[in-house]
Structure formats: structure tokens, C-alpha cells
Regions:
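Interhelical loop and helix-boundary elements at the membrane-water interface
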Residues: 2-55, 59-176, 189-231
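Residue-level marker of positions within ordered structural domains that often coincide
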Residues: 105, 183, 238-239
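Membrane-interfacial helix-loop-helix connectors in multipass membrane proteins
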Residues: 182-188
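Single conserved hydrophobic/aromatic residue that forms the stacking wall/gate
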Residues: 232-240
Length: 240
């Protein structure tokens, strides 16, 4: 009976039952759904249903905002590939750092609060980035390169707009609120850290994109991973 009460078994069962039911919805590719199932199983085992639910909400809203103005973005040649459906590289590129921190809560209880704050901030950063990118590409009136403030075309790596920047702030606040409501974080201080860190991480990703992405042929997924790793490093320094 202990096996059936095991959080990893519960997570595995719930994840793959839900994926079997909802996999026809065009939010992810087949590989994306499988990756989401593996991710969800580990998160449930490490952070119980709250950690799992927080990432489900992140994936849902990240996928939905990608669909906003998709026809327009496709006509402009700046839409996400595969009709906006998320593949394995998207799942792991955005979730790898958060997953690592979730796993660490099982092995280093003394720093569990720091790991949870880092976990929350990593997903706040990614939702902020998705909100900013997708809203900016559709509704941004003017786009500027973050490193020089020169006007550039929509969809340019490292490009920012007022509309996209405001959407990034909203995405970070929303994800921090979800983490607070689900008790991943528990204080107003941590809420502020997550919001600010999430937004600053989107700016850092824009800088990385502007300076290095095209020059060194970095994929969006690699830039995502670098962004969240830098974010955790800064959060850990703040908590020390």
C-alpha cells in the first residue's frame, strides 16, 4: 500500500491519465506531452500537487498567450513554429532550472526556502518572457534593441517594446501570485523577490539575445536555460 501512496506514483498516474484525455488539444506536440508528463511526475513527487499545479498553470497560460494574434504573427513571419505548439525542447528549456531546484528540496532541507523561491522565480521569469515576447510581437507599436535603443523590426532577438515590457511585468506578477496562493512561497518579501527577479530575468534574456544569440547561433531554448540559471544564481546570492 505504501507504493500506491508514494507521491511519485500518484504524480505519474494523474499526469498520464490527464495527458491521455487532453493530448488531442493542440497545445503541445506528442513529444511535448510526454515531456510534460515526466516533468509533472517529478514535480508532484518533490513539491506535491502545489508544485505540479503551478507549472500546469504556467504551461497553460504560456501556450494560450502564444495563440494571441497568431494569424498576424504568422503573416509577419515571427510566429512560433508548429502553430505555437510546445515541443520537448520548449518544455525542458524553460523548466530545467526549476526542475533541478524542485529536486534539491528533497536533498537539502536546510535550504528548502531558498530552493522554493528560486523555483518560483524561474517560472515567473519564463511566463514574463513569454507574455512580453508574444504580446510585444502582436501589439508592440515600436520595437527597440535593448542594448542600443535603435529601432528594429518586430521579432528581432533582443528587441523590446513598451507593450511587451508591460506584459512581462504582468506575467511576472501573475506567476508570483500563483506561487504565493499555492504556498510555494509564503511571505510578501519572497513575492517581491520573485516579481522583480522574474522581470529582470526577461531583460537579461533580451540582452543575451541582442549580443550573442545570432552571433553564436544560440537556440531560444539554450538562451532560456541560461536565463533561468542566471536568475537562480542571483536569487541565491540575495538569500545568503
Amino acid at each position: 500500500m505504501d507504493f500506491f501512496r508514494n507521491q511519485f506514483f500518484i504524480g505519474f498516474s494523474i499526469n498520464f491519465i490527464l495527458i491521455y484525455i487532453f493530448c488531442k488539444i493542440p497545445l503541445m506536440t506528442k513529444g511535448g506531452w510526454i515531456s510534460a508528463g515526466i516533468l509533472g511526475t517529478i514535480l508532484w513527487g518533490c513539491l506535491s500537487w502545489q508544485g505540479w499545479m503551478s507549472v500546469v498553470i504556467y504551461l497553460l497560460f504560456g501556450s494560450l498567450v502564444t495563440k494571441i494574434g497568431f494569424k498576424f504573427k504568422k503573416e509577419q513571419g515571427i510566429a512560433e513554429k508548429r502553430g505555437g505548439r510546445r515541443g520537448p525542447e520548449n518544455v525542458w528549456g524553460s523548466a530545467a532550472t526549476g526542475l533541478f531546484l524542485a529536486i534539491m528540496t528533497k536533498f537539502n532541507a536546510a535550504n528548502i526556502v531558498m530552493f522554493k523561491v528560486g523555483f518560483a522565480a524561474s517560472f515567473a521569469a519564463k511566463l514574463a518572457d513569454t507574455f512580453g515576447s508574444e504580446i510585444g510581437k502582436r501589439f508592440g507599436e515600436e520595437t527597440y534593441l535593448i542594448t542600443s535603443l535603435q529601432k528594429v523590426e518586430r521579432g528581432t532577438e533582443g528587441g523590446i517594446s513598451i507593450e511587451g515590457t508591460l506584459a512581462s511585468i504582468l506575467g511576472s506578477i501573475f506567476m508570483a501570485f500563483i506561487m504565493l496562493r499555492l504556498s510555494i512561497i509564503s511571505t510578501k518579501y519572497h513575492f517581491i523577490i520573485v516579481v522583480v527577479s522574474g522581470f529582470l530575468a526577461t531583460l537579461s534574456e533580451s540582452i543575451i539575445g541582442a549580443k550573442f544569440q545570432n552571433k553564436y547561433k544560440l537556440s531560444n531554448e539554450l538562451v532560456n536555460a541560461i536565463q533561468t540559471c542566471l536568475l537562480y544564481t542571483s536569487d541565491a546570492a540575495d538569500d545568503c
